[in-house]
């Protein structure tokens, strides 16, 4: 068990955690357990990233860039990649994210899950 919290730190709850190393592992854990949620940077407002009574799949190790088409500006990455890493990687290549939240310490998966800036 590990205590996890969200950005507001209003709740600090015990979770059964599993560290992910690939997507197949996540599918197996969800199929063989009760409800689960992916947890990365813990910057969600409210408690959207928490799952007391279920499992938390920590995806910070899923932090690889898979491809970049520099001509089209299309990047494929794993869900644990942070916006900080993306900015450090893309800006020297002449690319920027079209929108950014108030922090760079969020994961791509968290941005998608929370619909950050549409």
Where are the regions a protein language model picked out?
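N-terminal regions that are enriched for targeting/export leaders
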Residues: 1-6
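Glycine-rich N-terminal segment of FAD-binding domains in flavoprotein oxidoreductases
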Residues: 8-105, 114-117
